């Protein structure tokens, strides 16, 4: 596999022989949004995130965070939570005729989301540290993400991620 990385106006060419060491493939999408996510089977990173990261340590941090979601089975837990909500949606529909429009399914799926994100931050940092990546500026990476996505700065009951200040302080500790 050969590829080229452009960082700080420098072109670097790499050639690697892939070996399977992890059961979660990393898939790069062409999307310009600054985002990465895990689905329980794979890790997805957008071109926007690749462009946003200023160092390999930051990319490792993002990948490790998403890997932690998969390794800690957060996606499976969300699916299980959603099933509980689905049962309630169905019962209300059958017993009252009211269409909840999946409200309970959606709300139950988001149960513990902020805790899952905090755990993925912690486990991801640990993975980076034991892998030899520099995590000194990890909190500042998340601060930059907060500036890029101002909606993540404030906390509210519907948020799926901790607020940016909460995340920054948690990682700094």
Predicted feature residues:
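A Zn2+-metalloprotease active-site environment signal
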Residues: 1-173
